[in-house]
Amino acid sequence: MALNIENIIAEIKEASILELNDLVKAIEEEFGVTAAAPVAVAAAGGAEEATKDSFDVELTSAGDKKVGVIKAVREITGLGLKEAKGLVDGAPANIKEGVAAAEAEEIKAKLEEAGATITLK
């Protein structure tokens, strides 16, 4: 038995809304499917961070070892001593913006090792 697509489409065009509704229900029951559109699920806050492409590395606090943190900031940013000190003294401040996740984690580890408190945003 070969299907004639044109005949099926012509029959559907001539059917009323009620007949089409019954057809959809019959197809759903026969094949165990649903005609409902998939609903987009909102991501949780944690899941959103996991899919984030770039991060801002924020120095929240310099901690007790301010000199070590200033050295680390200079190394990471390439700033001069005065600029790096100003950045550390002005905490909270962004050290780097729009960096990849892996680089952000490296920067965070380096600054935390120096004694700073870091937040990735």
UniProtKB/Swiss-Prot annotation:
Q: Which SUPFAM superfamilies match?
A: ClpS-like, Ribosomal protein L7/12, oligomerisation (N-terminal) domain
The reply to whether Translocase figures as a keyword in the UniProt entry is no
Any one GO MF term held by the record is: mRNA binding
One Gene Ontology cellular component term attached to this UniProt record is: cytosolic large ribosomal subunit
Which GO biological process categories is it annotated with?
translation
Q: Which UniProt keywords apply?
A: Ribonucleoprotein, Ribosomal protein
Q: Which family is annotated?
A: Belongs to the bacterial ribosomal protein bL12 family.
Oligomeric state and partners?
A: Homodimer. Part of the ribosomal stalk of the 50S ribosomal subunit. Forms a multimeric L10(L12)X complex, where L10 forms an elongated spine to which 2 to 4 L12 dimers bind in a sequential fashion. Binds GTP-bound translation factors.
Under the heading PANTHER family, the entry gives: 39S RIBOSOMAL PROTEIN L12 (PTHR45987), LARGE RIBOSOMAL SUBUNIT PROTEIN BL12M (PTHR45987:SF4)
Sum up the protein's function in the record's words: Forms part of the ribosomal stalk which helps the ribosome interact with GTP-bound translation factors. Is thus essential for accurate translation.
Name of the protein in question: Large ribosomal subunit protein bL12
Native organism is Streptococcus equi subsp. equi (strain 4047)
